Regions:
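Generic structural signal for well-ordered alpha-helices
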Residues: 38, 61, 65, 103-107, ...
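Terminal-tail/helix-coil boundary detector
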Residues: 223-250, 254, 272-273, 287-344
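N-terminal binding-site loop/beta-alpha segment at the start of enzyme catalytic domains
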Residues: 1-76, 343-344
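Aromatic-lined glycan-binding groove of carbohydrate-active enzymes
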Residues: 187-223, 258
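Glycine/proline-rich, positively charged
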Residues: 26-27, 86-186, 190
Length: 344
């Protein structure tokens, strides 16, 4: 397994990061099987594991913690906070109040006294970034966290966070975790260049585009009836995306590779990508992914991929890496109705 430096942290991580979102009720409910998969990945050279408190509402972190007993020192362990964790208005988000509470829960479930990489899971429009960075800085100084990062942030918020850290003498975000795949290349426009500018490590999620780049889901073919497919079925309504998959399948076949291996090699070929997160649900899926870990693509193949999905573009609006709240929330685009009525 190839090793790469995680930004400027000095930490070396594997080119594949084991993602655990589908360990537990969100995919594979057999905890022992999930533990065996984690051990298999470690035995095959993967030293980077990513999870989150919200995955399975704490179930997944507990599985990871069980698997790492006796092997903690082998792993660069990353987790995330910010998602809603039960009842109550303050059990989520990026406030200091929640950050210091969330990390204690993660440490307990993971069975460790420190987290290598603690990440803000999503943008939080209700909390000043200085509030969050100040709390995270205290965690680093307390030895509970080694490095801090973000996930799903737009380029503007990454820049703002770097500026605030420098101005206030706070620890910097050292990584970003965006979605990136052949079908979702929007981050090549701003996010990846910004990460390069500030020396951030980049771990990308969904390099297989929610499974579309496995070749399992074909145009005009029956769709599997399972919980995961029901969750991502909205991504199968875009004919342009399915057309691209057919072209990519042909390209992969001509090159003598599976589409899965082609897609993973594409994601790790970008010079600003440190590690690509794999999310296997079964041991067979994990073994197949690891088999292709050494594949690299030549310029001829990458040029053909560019012709199918041009650099910096997405196929379909559902793949946009970050949609500002100013677009999704009408209250941020329209004055209150009573004000508009009074102005008539």
């Amino acid at each position: 397994m190839r090793m790469r430096r995680l930004g400027r942290t000095g930490i070396q991580v594997s080119a594949y990061c084991l993602g655990t979102m589908v360990f537990g009720k969100m995919g594979n409910p057999d905890h022992d099987d999930c533990v065996r998969m984690i051990h298999r990945a470690l035995d095959q050279g993967v030293n980077f594991i990513d999870t989150a408190d919200v995955y399975g509402y704490s179930e997944t972190e507990a599985i990871v913690g069980k698997a790492l007993k006796g092997r903690r020192d082998e792993v660069v362990l990353a987790t995330k906070f910010n998602g809603p964790m039960g009842e109550g208005p303050n059990r989520g988000g990026s406030s200091r109040r929640w950050v210091v509470q969330a990390v204690e829960g993660s440490l307990k479930r993971l069975g460790t006294d420190y987290i290598d990489l603690y990440q803000i899971h999503h943008p939080d429009p209700h909390t000043d970034v200085e509030e969050t960075l100040s709390a995270l800085t205290d965690l680093v100084r307390a030895g509970k966290v080694r490095a801090i990062g973000s996930s799903n942030l737009p380029a503007s918020e990454i820049v703002e966070a770097q500026w605030v850290s420098e101005r206030r003498g706070l620890h910097r975000l050292r990584t970003e975790q965006p979605t990136y795949s052949i079908l979702n290349r929007a981050v090549e426009r701003e996010v990846l260049p910004v990460c390069h500018r500030y020396g951030l490590g980049v771990l990308v999620w969904s390099p297989l585009a929610m499974g579309l780049l496995t070749g399992r889901y074909r145009k005009n073919a029956p769709r599997p009836d399972n919980a995961r497919m029901n969750w991502v079925s909205r991504h199968l309504t875009d004919e342009r995306k399915l057309d691209a998959v057919e072209q990519l399948l042909t390209l992969a076949e001509e090159a003598g590779h599976s589409l899965t291996h082609l897609a993973m090699a594409f994601a790790t070929s970008h010079p600003d990508v440190t590690s690509a997160i794999i999310g296997p649900r079964t041991m067979d899926q994990l073994d197949d992914l690891l088999t292709g870990a050494s594949l690299t693509l030549g310029d001829d193949i990458l040029d053909k991929i560019d012709a199918i999905v041009p650099p910096g573009t997405d196929i379909g609006p559902l793949d946009v890496s970050y949609v500002p709240l100013s677009l999704t929330r009408t209250d941020l685009r329209r004055r209150p109705s009573h004000e508009r009525a009074a102005a008539r």
